[in-house]
Amino acid sequence: MTVQTSKNPQVDIAEDNAFFPSEYSLSQYTSPVSDLDGVDYPKPYRGKHKILVIAADERYLPTDNGKLFSTGNHPIETLLPLYHLHAAGFEFEVATISGLMTKFEYWAMPHKDEKVMPFFEQHKSLFRNPKKLADVVASLNADSEYAAIFVPGGHGALIGLPESQDVAAALQWAIKNDRFVISLCHGPAAFLALRHGDNPLNGYSICAFPDAADKQTPEIGYMPGHLTWYFGEELKKMGMNIINDDIAGRVHKDRKVLTGDSPFAANALGKLAAQEMLAAYAG
């Protein structure tokens, strides 16, 4: 006998009119164990360069009908790339716009994963006690030890990051100083911070979560309503090219900008980023 799971968004009782994804959508798009593999870096980096993670600090995203989507950073999209980079020898720091703790989509946490969960527990304090991004930006110069900026996905990346002058300044610094920029899924929404000033990403090609897919997710209760705007449309207006129209786990490299299309690309993006950064800094 087949048990039917509900497509109704689930109530988040921590906030008025807020909702988690439906049981059905979670059954289709989350798993208690990740697809982490290929973590093999026999000659890891031994230097001081590290990763700056720009994380989400807000949980609730308004939708077109007034309901709130309970979101944050997607755990798979955050932790799998970092697992690879850490195994390759690169430590990381976490910053948020406010300096307040990172918000995660805990409903997507691979809670039975025997590698990812210990890694998360080991580094949880970094996400609970992040740096304030403005303080990091104020200290950036050509000699700063950050080798890359990583913006994880999850719909939380749509909140605050696209309008942040500090995000714009961090990205401008990274591109102009030949550092890596790594992102996936909804994370590239942060690139919209460059819209109203110097935009060094004009003409770059990336993978990202397709707007067309976002427009379909309310049908299965992943979100309680439709988005009020779509970041892919806006990225194209600022001169960026999104090369994928589906979510097949695709990754892409354009110079030092490394991107993936969805949580299905998290492991592959981690591999790509680790390999590229080792070639640049440990070769």
Curated annotation (Swiss-Prot):
Top enzyme class: hydrolase
One of the record's GO cellular component terms: cytoplasm
Alphabetized GO MF terms: glyoxalase III activity; protein deglycase activity; thiolester hydrolase activity; zinc ion binding
Reaction(s) this enzyme catalyzes, per UniProt: N(omega)-(1-hydroxy-2-oxopropyl)-L-arginyl-[protein] + H2O = lactate + L-arginyl-[protein] + H(+); N(6)-(1-hydroxy-2-oxopropyl)-L-lysyl-[protein] + H2O = lactate + L-lysyl-[protein] + H(+); S-(1-hydroxy-2-oxopropyl)-L-cysteinyl-[protein] + H2O = lactate + L-cysteinyl-[protein] + H(+); N(omega)-(1-hydroxy-2-oxoethyl)-L-arginyl-[protein] + H2O = L-arginyl-[protein] + glycolate + H(+)
Record-listed Zn(2+) binding positions: 86, 91, 123
E.C. code: 3.1.2.-, 3.5.1.-, 3.5.1.124
Induction, per UniProt: By heat shock.
Compartments it resides in: Cytoplasm
Matches recorded under InterPro entries: Class_I_gatase-like, HchA, Prot/Nucl_acid_deglycase
Gene Ontology biological process: DNA repair; methylglyoxal catabolic process to D-lactate via S-lactoyl-glutathione; protein repair
Function (record text): Protein and nucleotide deglycase that catalyzes the deglycation of the Maillard adducts formed between amino groups of proteins or nucleotides and reactive carbonyl groups of glyoxals. Thus, functions as a protein deglycase that repairs methylglyoxal- and glyoxal-glycated proteins, and releases repaired proteins and lactate or glycolate, respectively. Deglycates cysteine, arginine and lysine residues in proteins, and thus reactivates these proteins by reversing glycation by glyoxals.
Entry-linked HAMAP family: Deglycase_HchA
Identification of the protein by name: Protein/nucleic acid deglycase HchA
Gene (name only): hchA
